[in-house]
Amino acid sequence: MAPVRGDGMRGLAVFISDIRNCKSKEAEVKRINKELANIRSKFKGDKTLDGYQKKKYVCKLLFIFLLGHDIDFGHMEAVNLLSSNKYSEKQIGYLFISVLVNTNSDLIRLIIQSIKNDLQSRNPVHVNLALQCIANIGSRDMAESFSNEIPKLLVSGDTMDVVKQSAALCLLRLFRSSPDIIPGGEWTSRIIHLLNDQHMGVVTAATSLIDALVKCNPDEYKGCVNLAVSRLSRIVTASYTDLQDYTYYFVPAPWLSVKLLRLLQNYNPVTEEAGVRARLNETLETILNKAQEPPKSKKVQHSNAKNAVLFEAINLIIHSDSEPNLLVRACNQLGQFLSNRETNLRYLALESMCHLATSEFSHEEVKKHQEVVILSMKMEKDVSVRQMAVDLLYAMCDRGNAEEIVQEMLNYLETADYSIREEMVLKVAILAEKYATDYTWYVDVILNLIRIAGDYVSEEVWYRVIQIVINREEVQGYAAKTVFEALQAPACHENMVKVGGYILGEFGNLIAGDSRSAPLVQFKLLHSKYHLCSPMTRALLLSTYIKFINLFPEIRTNIQDVFRQHSNLRSADAELQQRASEYLQLSIVASTDVLATVLEEMPSFPERESSILAVLKKKKPGRVPENEIRESKSPAPTSGPGSVLQNNVHVNNSHSKLNNSNANTDLLGLSTPPANNVGSNSNSTLIDVLGDIYGSNNNSSAVYNTKKFLFKNNGVLFENEMLQIGVKSEFRQNLGRLGLFYGNKTQVPLSNFNPVLQWSAEETLKLNVQMKAVEPTLEAGAQIQQLLTAECIEDYADAPTIEISFRYNGTQQKFSIKLPLSVNKFFEPTEMNAESFFARWKNLSGEQQRSQKVFKAAQPLDLPGARNKLMGFGMQLLDSVDPNPDNMVCAGIIHTQSQQVGCLMRLEPNKQAQMFRLTVRASKETVTREICDLLADQF
């Protein structure tokens, strides 16, 4: 009788030992080749191998493959092991197949049939081996071959729990590679109800599967919310016994609790049912209460499990952002963790508070921990925690604490880790600009940034300070004085030289009256830095010098000497040679008037999104709050360093800078360039000038139509035979600025010209409009401008009117026009995906939160035209959100001084009836009516 062999496989152990004892690569290859020859002879021999021998040789082949050698035989023997009833042999067969067999193998059909046989087995061990093999391979072929069998195993009442668990995980693996394999219909409900299973392994695996399914198809699996809330409540609440015996260091089912909390975060709002919402809130409160209880164990495993559930609950509270009480409690709990001795807890607390700082309900609570966060930034040993503290200070900053936070960040920047300095510089620059009430403070901050961390100040930052100084007349003298003083330091960073050269070249004349900063002193100070700078900075300084010739003719000779030195072979850089040579000739040949025209002061830069903010969003896309995307729109002055140098010498532009009327205007940072007076007597010339401004061809037949300005900001607002009125406007959050351009089309002056704002005191409490006075005489063929600023305090229904009166040929003229200041001008577009949009849409289903109108199309249905109008209305037109491609949906936030009002809109065309249905939903009743009234009959 043959001896009974165990599973030790002594031959395999000896072979592995021989390989380990090899002294060289050649010896190892020789031993492997010898073994391969032996295995090949055994497989091809006349003697039939038993299961043990096949298993042993297949294991050797597998080991050789794992050493990095190709295996081109033994596959059939491994497949034969699948039909064995012995676990160890079947296990090795599946292991070999999972590792070595690819889906293009000739044996794949035979393998699939063997797997199907095991799936139908009554032995749960064999079924599990088959499921594990399917999951390990996880190919499209496997998904298609077993898309029917695995779901049946998962929901069948006869399937053992351990098999259900494996089936759920196997299905999850296949779903990730082939999302279309999961059957719908009645299967959906049966899969969801696995959340009620009493087996810990089954419900945990099922939760992972359902979480993946919900991310792909949230509407179909929305029924899981009620079950997840119910199960979570039973686990957390002590009065229930659900899974209370599955405790990990006194924490009931912590992994399942975390998975259920993450599952619920796929929906916003989590649920619309009041009862379910109340139960969820009660559960979250219970979790927060348990966090306050004394620990039941001193072991770290207890605190880790307890805190894992707590932090996931806080994430759900932040995700919902609808329960002020829970948000405040979560903030207070996180505040306690800021002083915890565990580094990971402090990091997680700071990270969660970054999200809480963006909520209107908890922002003020987060600010209460400002001092502790500042200490974390300065004192933490771990750089990642210090980095997170900086992120939190950035997130909690507002107009009330901006100066303090910016100063603390500047102080820390001197000793900060090199890895976080560049990002800190960007954040300080953004905060200083965003919350500047006095732009002299902003200039001080940026110059300090350059002084402290000049190497980390990117081009976008120093471009930015130049733009702001050029666009704001009231800060130009201070900037010139401050940068002049900064340049006197013995060691001066090159970025400081760039800023100083640019600003002194433009505004050095503003400080030239002081003998300490006389023209020659300015020139010598800048030129003392010249030889220490890169060619790019030297080129900028040469441009500054030619500007000095225009500003200070008395030092022309000194500057021309410098140009002569660098226009010959003494300068190795071709760009510097050419620039110096051209500037020298310009200073010699050009008359004073020509020189003044060519080298006149730079005009205001156009307004775009802040390039600094764009850089920060690229570096930290997840940590820049969405509401900052439109915060700072003063642009980088150029697209690159070269263009700064080129633009420093500027040919005369027909536009001049618009003077700011008040502090609000300054903060807006808008630069609407007015057209200069036109002295021509030709009507057509005047109209052409306006056409240049507005980018459109206007003519004398234009009619007054304020409704078209619902969808545009610039254009001709009014025109008759005497007067043409153009408008150019810009808006940011709840602030706006309009430039009105009055053009006299007649051959005689218009006297007693007087525009008067018609806007009641009651309406001013909702929309505050300030208007700058204009000259009383509008000369023939001339154009003047008038600046208006607007601040939206709360939503309003009407728009202000301006009454214009003047005398023409002795006859009094008077008429009124509506200003394009409807409430939609204060929209901020909001990006949403389909899930978020319809979740929010359903949440705003109350009678007072919606308004609807059905109206006949004013002209044959023009869907592209309707889309273009909506794109200009101020809201974000959301593509691929509505299931009906003809429907148009939009989202936006109306910014007022008192609050922000979220608004959703849906426009549904009916091509057959030539009609539209317009639905507007918002969190404020008056807004729904106002937006609906504005848009009705516009299509």
UniProtKB/Swiss-Prot annotation:
**Pfam families given in the database record:** Adaptin_N, Alpha_adaptin_C, Alpha_adaptinC2
Tell me the leader sequence span: none
**Alphabetic keyword roster:** Cell membrane, Coated pit, Endocytosis, Membrane, Protein transport, Transport
Cellular component terms (Gene Ontology): AP-2 adaptor complex; clathrin-coated pit; plasma membrane; presynapse
Question: What's the protein's topology in the membrane?
Answer: Peripheral membrane protein
Q: Where is the composition biased (Basic and acidic residues)?
A: 623-633
Intracellular or extracellular location(s): Cell membrane; Membrane, Coated pit
Question: InterPro entries per the record?
Answer: Adaptor_Complx_Large_Subunit, AP2_complex_asu, ARM-like, ARM-type_fold, Clathrin/coatomer_adapt-like_N, Clathrin_a-adaptin_app_sub_C, Clathrin_a/b/g-adaptin_app_Ig, Clathrin_app_Ig-like_sf
* Highest taxon of source: Eukaryota
- Extract one GO molecular function annotation from the record: clathrin adaptor activity
Which GO biological process annotations does it have?
A: clathrin-dependent endocytosis; intracellular protein transport; protein transport; synaptic vesicle endocytosis
Q: Which residue intervals make up region (Disordered)? A: 623-660
Q: Which spans of this chain does the record mark as coiled coil?
A: none
| Comp. bias (Polar residues) | 635-660
What does the sequence similarity comment in the record state about its family? Belongs to the adapter complexes large subunit family.
Q: Summarize the subunit comment.
A: Adaptor protein complex 2 (AP-2) is a heterotetramer composed of two large adaptins (alpha-type and beta-type subunits), a medium adaptin (mu-type subunit AP50) and a small adaptin (sigma-type subunit AP17).
Q: What does this protein do?
A: Adaptins are components of the adapter complexes which link clathrin to receptors in coated vesicles. Clathrin-associated protein complexes are believed to interact with the cytoplasmic tails of membrane proteins, leading to their selection and concentration. Alpha adaptin is a subunit of the plasma membrane adapter.
The identity of this protein, by name, is AP-2 complex subunit alpha
**Which organism is this protein's natural source?**
Drosophila pseudoobscura pseudoobscura (Fruit fly)
